[in-house]
């Protein structure tokens, strides 16, 4: 497992996308030494990190990515993720947007780029199979974000597993004592199974 500490505000789009792309190239270039299966590179992101992961999965093949990384057309295909795990992701810049995420992501290019980062409209046949979970009562990033993305995945015939848990606040992580700290509201036993479900998904496909 590798963790990317990507640039946030004041850095703006597409800085983090390019950092993620460079990270994938580094991982694949060192796959043998690091004992990594090159065909099992899975992106996982939560909340705004979910937007980054899903965004990259949608645009990895676009010229602005390969140009930004200064790589050849052939090397472009080394960027393709094999799978995607999204936890309560920010997806849409439309009616159900988490607006502050897009203000920070786009900075002074907000009006110019807002529509292009509404990911339910960016899904294409090159997006990998995807696992998504969200809670019905998420008050920060509405569940519609995951529903919109899953609907777009289905429309593009992308294999998808979607779990909507009945209750729980935003940012639950593992939804247990390990990640809740002093926040009792982040201990939600009904949501804990997401990790085992994601593990089963990984074992089955990868």
For each predicted feature, which ranges?
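Catalytic nucleophile-loop/oxyanion-hole region of alpha/beta-hydrolase
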Residues: 2-38, 188-190
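Primarily recognizes the serine-hydrolase "nucleophile elbow" in alpha/beta-hydrolase
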Residues: 22-98, 110, 114-115
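Short beta-strand/loop motif that positions the catalytic acidic residue
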Residues: 126, 131-134, 138
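Acidic beta-to-alpha connecting loop that harbors the catalytic carboxylate
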Residues: 136-139, 167-169
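C-terminal catalytic histidine-bearing segment of alpha/beta-hydrolase fold enzymes
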Residues: 147-206
């Amino acid at each position: 497992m590798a963790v990317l500490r990507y640039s946030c505000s004041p850095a703006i789009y597409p800085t983090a996308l390019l950092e993620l792309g460079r990270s994938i190239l580094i991982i694949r270039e060192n796959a043998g030494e690091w004992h990594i299966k090159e065909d099992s590179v899975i992106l996982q992101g939560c909340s705004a990190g979910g937007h980054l992961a899903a965004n990259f999965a949608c645009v990895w093949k676009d010229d602005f990515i390969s140009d930004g990384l200064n790589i050849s057309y052939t090397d472009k295909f080394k960027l393709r993720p094999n799978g995607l795990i999204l936890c309560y992701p920010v997806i849409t810049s439309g009616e159900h947007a988490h607006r502050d995420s897009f203000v920070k992501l786009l900075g002074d290019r907000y009006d110019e780029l807002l529509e292009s980062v509404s990911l339910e409209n960016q899904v294409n046949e090159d997006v990998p199979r995807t696992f998504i979970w969200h809670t019905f009562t998420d008050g920060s990033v509405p569940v519609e974000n995951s529903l919109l993305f899953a609907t777009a995945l289905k429309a593009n015939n992308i294999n998808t597993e979607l779990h909507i848990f009945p209750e729980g606040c935003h940012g639950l992580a593992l939804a247990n004592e390990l990640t809740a700290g002093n926040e009792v509201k982040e201990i939600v036993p009904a949501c804990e199974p997401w990790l085992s479900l994601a593990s089963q998904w990984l074992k089955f496909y990868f």
